[in-house]
Amino acid sequence: MHILFANTGCEHPNTLKFVHQCEQYFGWNVVWLECKVNHGERKSSGYRIVDYATASIHGEPYADMVAKYGMPNIASPHCTRELKLAPIRAWCKDQFGIAIVDTCIGIRADETRRINPKTAEKQKLHYPLAEWGIDKQDVLDFWNEQPFDLEIPEWLGNCTWCFKKSDTKLAKSLADYPQGFDFPKHIEIIHPVDKYGNKTAIFRKHRTVADIEKMLEVTGIPPEQMITEGGCSESCEVLAAFEDD
């Protein structure tokens, strides 16, 4: 079994710390990947091997992806394809001679709405937690018994500022971890317009970071119960989102 972690450079630092702690405590040999964009070529991204000490923490892989493909958004989420799917498949191709191999995904029994049987069969995806009846409380109980945990709330998972997150999660993320939005601010400055000449707008409804900041100022910080009940619905679907690949 091989455990892969595709780093975008936009995760919360505690996410990287958590992966490293899992390596140390459970004895896992995690393969840390980052995308290697093939500029000037009509081919998907490759990969580079990193580790906890060398992993990008300032959005470098993401910025490199944007330089070639433009800024992704809810209508064109190519970030998942190039930052996660492509490096993982490229690594598998080098290791096993084929890009699509049997892959276990951590979707729980209470998240089966996220499972597409057709995609699962085509992509060789398996969902052991769902098959074993493991739900969110089971997962929480397991980590409560461990000497460490992720140490970040749900809304700061994946890329801290991800445009797939709901407004309430974005507002809470901005309030709790404002420095996480420095990267999309930077992207808006260096790429003020998209390839069609339109103003770069990362978030839903063609909004910018300034719009999200204004939303937080007007609405205030949302209570946690408005957020945690949403589960992982705005998660980054590494494989299941690309049924036709």
Regions found by a protein language model. Name each.
Residues 1-245:
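Nucleotide-activated chemistry modules centered on ATP-dependent adenylation/adenylyltransferase
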